[in-house]
């Protein structure tokens, strides 16, 4: 089983517990996945970078974040030589939440 580390702190395994956020890379918004402990700080860094670059900060929508997570977990399952039950469980939870329609 491959381990995917948080790109911010490099300490936590985010294989089955990732949190979507974004970074500003030369003026281009790029999605990244961080651990639970780094999420707020990473989102604050993105907000500050957006405001500094005069791009305007728009929070990541819940459904957009869930779609990013779904793609992340699907890629983990496709890359993984073994079938990790934690990743499969996380993917099932994300797909369940995506299936719920907005009221």
Residue ranges and their predicted role:
Residues 46-103:
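Short, intrinsically disordered terminal segments enriched in charged and Pro/Gly residues
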Residues 1-2, 103:
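The identity of the second residue at the extreme N-terminus of proteins
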């Amino acid at each position: 089983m491959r381990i995917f580390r948080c790109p911010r702190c490099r300490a936590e395994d985010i294989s089955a517990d990732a949190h979507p956020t974004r970074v500003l890379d030369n003026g281009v918004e790029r999605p990244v996945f961080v651990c639970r402990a780094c999420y707020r700080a990473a989102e604050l860094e993105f907000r500050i970078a957006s405001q500094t670059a005069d791009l305007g900060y728009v929070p990541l929508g819940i459904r957009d974040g869930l779609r990013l997570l779904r793609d992340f977990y699907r890629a983990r399952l496709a890359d993984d030589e073994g079938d990790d039950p934690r990743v499969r469980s996380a993917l099932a939870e994300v797909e369940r939440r995506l299936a719920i329609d907005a009221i």
